[in-house]
Amino acid sequence: DNCIPITDEEYFEDDIVGLFCAWLKKVYGEDTLEENLDFIANALGNKGKTSREVIRNYFLKDFIKDHIKTYQKRPIYWLFDSGKQNGFKALIYMHRWNADTIGNVRVEYLHRIQRVYEKEIIRMQEIIDNSHYNKEISSATKRKEKLQKQIKETKDYDAKIAHLALSRIDIDLDDGVKVNYEKVQTADGKKMQILAKI
């Protein structure tokens, strides 16, 4: 359906890291998966305790910058980006864009991650209320605060993206990346920043 979610934690099997691992398994075999992930993580050199975390952080923070630079500010992968809290990010391939893309991203992916955050906030509160360990309570409190910021960011983003989804904006590939990139973020003459800046 032309949408790959990028999450800061492993919430879905079909997020970008899950799909990347599935691709590595298919191409190089399951026996060498961890070795290949370690090799890639070492090459990326990002932050993270495990190779999957390093790869996740790369996709979350650096992939789109590298992609925009490689394609000289005319990216073929567009990043839906809710903001600094990394509440919602998803890649789409511009050549598969259609009038329902924004609506699909909103309903199938944005609302899905919002439900995950709501459940995680409840789970963190249960840990805070029931744990006897200060370290666990402190960790759950910190995570809950982060999740609350992310849910707020995604709800603010949802308000922007909803209007654009109702507009059912299609693109014309002949107009080029820059024109279409602006077009899909504009409704009724007003630009709403829903994609990463290029």
Roles of regions detected by a PLM:
Residues 1-198:
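Terminal accessory regions of large proteins
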